[in-house]
Amino acid sequence: MRNGLYSIHIQMGDGVKGRASGVLMLRDGKFLGGDPYFWSKGTYTFREGSWKGEVVTNQHTPYHDPTARPVFAGREVTTGFSGTYQNDRSEVFGTSLVGSRSVSFQATLRRLADI
């Protein structure tokens, strides 16, 4: 994985209806990013087209829609992921532990700029 600014598009699995989009800044095995409601930081390792890591996500802004049911519901959530990368794109799969429930997801990252 090249250092840079990446867009991320996440689709939840396990029958959970949820998705999110945001940005991540990856640099030398660490990353930081977020979207309008959540921020995340984590670490990763990579080699020969594969990468894996761990991310901790927190909510920074509550939803204004009272009918919205955020998957993470204001909790700090730890997620493990692994995936592949080639050129400026990556596909990852992971699992988040939300309380006592595990929620899977897949995400696509696209490199936007150097940092």
Residue ranges: model-predicted function:
Residues 8, 31-34, 51-55, 90-95:
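Short hydrophobic/aromatic-rich beta-strand segments that constitute the beta-sheet cores
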Residues 24-26, 42, 83, 109:
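Broad, structure-driven detector of short, well-ordered beta-strand segments within folded domains
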Residues 12, 34-39, 56-60, 96-102:
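Short, solvent-exposed aromatic-acidic interface loops
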Residues 36-87:
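Contiguous, well-ordered beta-strand patches that form the walls/edges
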Residues 21-32:
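Short, flexible N-terminal segments of the mature chain
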Residues 1-16, 92:
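Tryptophan-anchored aromatic micro-motifs
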Residues 21, 45-48, 91-115:
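Edge beta-strand at a domain terminus
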Residues 14-16, 52, 61-63, 102, ...:
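Residue-level signal for secondary-structure boundary sites
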